């Protein structure tokens, strides 16, 4: 009995075809590099020819495996080592001069290169994520590039952000400490935003930043000792980006106002002394460059939110007048300008219109504030004549009619007495 292993049959004369995927994978990074460099050199400055070469070559080279090498060469002309140094810089046969970093430093040329990346990524969709990672990596390498190379990368990034090839979150690399400390992040951001705005507009840029929650991080482009609105505004305005300066100031003001409102609500609920609230608000105004017009409206909102109002119309007016009489000295401190007084009158009008139980309270609140020196005769007359809002204007103008007539008569009497003297 034969106990040995039975030999398996052997096929002869049969050739096995290597799958395309396996064919691609046999390429080493150096072979891949040489093929791409040669293709770029042959295309020269003809970017249409380059785009065509990349399209065709993707069917035989493994772009998926060597995506970082591909993008390194297209942007820097060579494979890059960590930090941004060129691996093959000594061997000119392994480097191409036909890349983004060696292109002319103008928007039109860089936009043409951006179109090459657009076509490539549309053709090979799987490269999308790899390209995002490449740009994030290159941003971290900025220190290793020349100023001109940084500028071209900034312009390319701006154009690609504008056309949607890159998502805004890739910009988080710019918040790296070593880039921020040396001023590279802020300088890069200015050039990038200019290219982005040139493709779209400032509103598109600020909208994209908001959606990516990057609007709150813009100050982090600067070192800690310069992370304030004043420095940001000066830097970006001088760079010709006033739209972004205004945007940041608005965002910071909104954020500050929310925090201020929250703190005021807390202090009012604890019934803190008015003088302490005044000191706190003045400090916040100075620290955050808040204008009186913004603060007076905020105070009114906080005061009206601090009370559980009676649902009966005949009782709520008395309740409101008692509450507002107590806090009139607080409002008076922050209504020293005609514009602030007008803002307050409009806020009162809006509140009384939106809260039906207060419809009949409007004129009584205004008279109370007039007597407490919160609003002046001039502000009331201005509101009455042409500065009132549309909301419930007929009702409120009718309520104020007798008081306005009284003010006018008092003024006329005062003038006639002056003439007699």
Swiss-Prot record:
GO cellular component, as recorded: cytoplasm
Location of region: Disordered: 1-24
Pfam families linked to this entry: HEAT_5MP1_2 (PF25504), W2 (PF02020)
CDD domains assigned: W2_eIF5C_like
GO biological process: regulation of translational initiation
PROSITE patterns: W2 (PS51363)
Protein name per Swiss-Prot or TrEMBL: eIF5-mimic protein 1
InterPro entries: ARM-type_fold, eIF5-mimic_regulator, W2_BZW1/2, W2_domain
Primary localization: cytoplasm
Cited function: Translation initiation regulator which may repress non-AUG initiated translation and repeat-associated non-AUG (RAN) initiated translation by acting as a competitive inhibitor of eukaryotic translation initiation factor 5 (EIF5) function.
PANTHER family reported for this sequence: BASIC LEUCINE ZIPPER AND W2 DOMAIN-CONTAINING PROTEIN, EIF5-MIMIC PROTEIN 1
Keywords recorded for this protein, A-Z: Cytoplasm, Translation regulation
Membership in a protein family: Belongs to the BZW family.
Superkingdom of the organism of origin: Eukaryota
Name of the gene encoding the protein in the UniProt record: bzw2
Location of the protein in the cell: Cytoplasm
Keyword Cytoplasm: yes
Domain W2: 250-417
